């Protein structure tokens, strides 16, 4: 069975936390998640999310599109958890990643203070010995945290 985005890539060191979802928001499994100024979960993008608040990966889909802030919660992988996400472009093994405008992981190419890094690209499924670079649309393993 092939890995799917939002699945956990390793069974140890797993950290999961629930966050209240922002009003009129849908969070999709396997996509990067950030917290807005009110502390509610929203889709992370290149302009939404801060290192101080963290960037996470949703492990379930939650539809709060017709709800108020906090009506629903989403469970997210946090900390140093290894999780499958979708590459939003080419990423080299070991590079730090950030969210793109589709909440996918892309290579973080500028200095740390200028971008919201969420983790590091480790490889594809079953590539512990000789990982390869990722291409747009690949399902990849990211170790969250810096």
Feature locations, PLM:
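Surface-exposed, low-hydrophobicity beta-strand/loop segments enriched in small/polar/acidic residues
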Residues: 1-146
């Amino acid at each position: 069975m092939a890995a799917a985005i939002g699945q956990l890539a390793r069974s140890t060191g797993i950290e999961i936390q629930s966050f209240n979802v922002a009003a009129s928001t849908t969070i999709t499994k396997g996509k990067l998640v950030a917290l807005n100024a009110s502390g509610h979960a929203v889709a992370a993008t290149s302009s939404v999310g801060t290192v101080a608040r963290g960037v996470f990966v949703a492990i379930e889909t939650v539809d709060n599109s017709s709800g108020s802030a906090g009506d629903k919660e989403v469970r997210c992988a946090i900390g140093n958890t290894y999780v499958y996400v979708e590459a939003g472009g080419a990423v080299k093994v070991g590079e730090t990643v950030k969210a793109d405008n589709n909440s996918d992981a892309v290579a973080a190419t500028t200095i740390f203070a200028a971008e919201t890094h969420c983790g590091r690209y480790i490889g594809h499924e079953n590539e512990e010995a000789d990982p390869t670079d990722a291409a747009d649309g690949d399902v990849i393993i990211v170790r969250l945290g810096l």
